[in-house]
Amino acid sequence: MQSSAQTVSDYLEEVPAERKAALIRLRNLCCDLLPGFEETMMYGGPVYARGGVAEVGFASQKHFIGLYILNNEVMDAHRHLLKAKGISLGKGCIRYARPERIDFAVVEQILKAAAQSNGQICA
């Protein structure tokens, strides 16, 4: 869902009720585990940027919750773990068809790796 919300808090007020708790939890993890990143709205959704470059984001899409890990190194390092759990993946996108499919322990690992990495960002 592309939003015109100006803040992440406003964005979270617009999401479907059945996804809201999961998205709030994703936001809290991003805020806690991505020190030095700025929380902002870009591309119609919440984004966490470092040095003005978006590296992590999430969004409530029509058919899934998307977690966007735009660091190639981090995404590639966790791809096998996500595939083993049957999660749909794109180049820099993790697609959760239902909120209950989100393994927050794995998300935490990914976010910690993103915070520590300086790898190539997806174009």
Protein language model regions, located:
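Charge-dense, helix-prone N-terminal extensions
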Residues: 1-123
